Amino acid sequence: DTECVCTKELHRVCGSDGVTYDNECLATCHGASVAHDHACEGHEEHHVDEHGEDHD
């Protein structure tokens, strides 16, 4: 596992995996591409923060 270094910038994006990430860097670090800006809709309500913690 390589550690990703991302800023704490809050610019939520919806990942291709249906997870809301706090920013594009975090989505990329988790192997997801950005589906669109803003939180995901129509999926379980959870997101991954800069610590890699999943919040539901």
Curated annotation (Swiss-Prot):
Protein name (record): Bdellin B-3
Keywords, ordered alphabetically: Disulfide bond, Protease inhibitor, Serine protease inhibitor
Positions of the Kazal-like domain: 1-42
One Pfam family hit: Kazal_1
Classification via SUPFAM superfamilies: Kazal-type serine protease inhibitors
GO molecular function: serine-type endopeptidase inhibitor activity
Residues flagged as site, Reactive bond: K8, E9
Highest taxon of the lineage: Eukaryota
Role: Proteinase inhibitor. Blocks the activity of trypsin, plasmin and sperm acrosin.
Disulfide bonds: C4-C29, C6-C25, C14-C40
Cited InterPro entries: Kazal_dom, Kazal_dom_sf
